[in-house]
């Protein structure tokens, strides 16, 4: 099938945007998409094509295999002529997926805008599927479509803000202004370019990917040692979520575990539980770890780190040189 480069190619992946009922759950495609298509036809002049997608779910259940599914769906449509994409997904893992896709299409000539909503497009308790004009859903979608027509790259569009997709984070569980990131008015981050492997290899690695996290709490240092000791060979990488600018307790046992993980080629990336400004080597309480092969998360959010690690892992490129 060939696509027109000027058309907007929509992918509906579920989430609050297309949810309905009490409690909310994503509507199946055969019920929701005709309603969405009619709305688009009545309110927009541009032509939209809804791509076939069988992965419609609450975003809290997305896995690496789902991430690579969306990569392949977009890549295939791009090979057939499509250049403008809008992906509607749930907000829980939107930033994780956006980061992954931003690296996947870093050097592509497409426009890909990832969006969602904090409230459903439809009135939740009305069985007639009426549009809720007080919801943020339509505003986010129409803004995303506009961005796909005017910018090239991979973006997150939310609450009238356009962010580079490689480094965003959901910072509010209720309000429409739920995301934070690097606005497109500022330069985007730069990363080493990774040439994608054939999709069968990417798919294989996604099925076995296992990125773990350790969230520090003010417990006895031995608890950190035990959590590190529990990391085994089937782990792809570890995200160490530390205090402040990346501070964490230091002990001989922790150092030994960090050295062990390095010897097993399991990267450990340090980030912060703080939502803004990332980690640094300002304090001795955190800088010591980098002498023991820990990678710095820099100013990347936790979802941004996950997305970058996963893209490197599925392409056999998980190394400090590529980080």
Regions found by a protein language model. Give the residues of each.
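Active-site histidine-anchored catalytic micro-motif
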Residues: 2-323
